[in-house]
């Protein structure tokens, strides 16, 4: 799968998932906790805003910081959606009951080596990008 295809799938997956947030649909506003590069956060939220006529804003933090915020905000969530970051904190948040279940229809397009993970844990997370951390 090419990087261009991967980036397109990332954007499509994010837009599809963002469209299902009830808060955004009800109030015309969306707050996204974003744990990827700032430029990606900006492009995804801008594309969503344009496509769905919703005021989408993002708060950029590392995955660990976002997990801490979500834990602290359990009784009064301040964001509608968490996009990006490493998978372990997403799985931990799901186990703690901090995330709503959602399965992306685009999971069928995930590379074969990640299919089993998505079949087991895909109600709370989805592979949206792949990045080398070292060689």
What are these regions (language model features)?
Residues 13-16, 88:
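Short, linear, compositionally biased motifs with a strong N-terminal bias
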Residues 26-92:
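Early extracytoplasmic/lumenal segment of secretory-pathway proteins
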Residues 77-82, 100-134:
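A structural signal for short loop-to-beta-strand junctions that line the ligand-binding cleft
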Residues 22-23, 71-72, 125:
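Short, flexible, glycine/charge-rich loop motifs used to bind or transfer phosphoryl groups or to couple energy/partner
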């Amino acid at each position: 799968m090419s990087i261009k295809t991967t980036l397109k799938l990332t954007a499509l997956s994010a837009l599809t998932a963002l469209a299902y947030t009830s808060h955004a649909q009800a109030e015309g506003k969306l707050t996204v906790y974003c744990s990827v590069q700032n430029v990606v956060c900006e492009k995804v939220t801008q594309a969503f805003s344009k496509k769905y006529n919703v005021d989408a804003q993002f708060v950029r933090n590392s995955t660990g910081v976002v997990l801490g915020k979500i834990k602290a905000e359990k009784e009064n969530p301040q964001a509608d959606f968490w996009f990006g970051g490493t998978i372990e904190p997403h799985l931990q948040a799901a186990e703690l009951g901090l995330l709503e279940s959602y399965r992306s229809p685009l999971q069928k397009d995930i590379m074969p080596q990640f299919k089993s993970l998505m079949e087991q844990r895909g109600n709370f997370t989805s592979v949206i990008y792949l990045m080398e951390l070292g060689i």
